[in-house]
């Protein structure tokens, strides 16, 4: 084994170790300032681990890096962290910056406790479809603007404080990625794969995300606004405390998704599937759910205002302890639905199927049970004015106008 790749003997003094290290690796991997962050007794172990990493880099053909090699390098950094004073691997980061001059080149900077360990420009391999392969990288503080990243692969990536702005990300793969405080601003994400991602405090603003797979994704506290989600799949997605604002999402699949404690305003869910969705303690305002499925959906403790659910399947839906204002359920199926301890203001049940419903209405402090067979015929019961609730009257002519206005308001700000 040549001198450049040899290990320092344990019999050498600390002075000899430092000398040999400086001689063979100065300005290449790590300096004494970085080493000083580790315990003195651990210098030999640190140098040995870094030398292993250096040999891996030296073995790369033309500077290219593979998934397997990247995993090995990352593991060595984790091993190094275990010997650090803090024994924390979260202080180790790989920061990646896309080069505007050379589209396929990025600068990778390794940090240990905020000290630069290794600088290198490597070529990101292209995928078979022409995109770039960023898979399994740890990308912190990355900012990519106005780039074509279509067909790229970010599978298994860890993205922290990342920004993608004005990018074409058609058919991009984020499968199993971990995202913390990520922003997609004015990006094309159509036909992309976000299945099983873990996103915290992420934002999609003014994006086109049609036909996107969000299957089993964890997106708590996500902020999605002015975005198109047509035909996208959120099956069993966890989206607690999500904020959806001015979103076009016809035919979207939210089957068994969890949107508890969420806020939804100005949404077009026409022909959508929200069956078995958990909307406990959510706020729904100005929602178009015409001809949609809400079978066995949980709307407990929920506030609904100006929600249009005409011609929808809402059998077995649970409205217990909910507040409903200016909502339309005419011509919908509400068989065996539950509305116990519910407050209703200007709610339209014309021609709805309400057989087997369990209903008790809160009026002031009084809880009044109602026979479901007479619910529709007692429409005037829900026509009272309330100073804290305003809305359109219950005429059939106004229902389509309300739905069209909701969609028009969304489109006005989504262009």
Question: How would you label these PLM feature ranges?
Answer:
Residues 25, 68, 95-98, 111-411:
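Tandem repeat scaffolds
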Residues 3-8, 12-133, 372-415:
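N-terminal capping/linker segments that flank leucine-rich repeat
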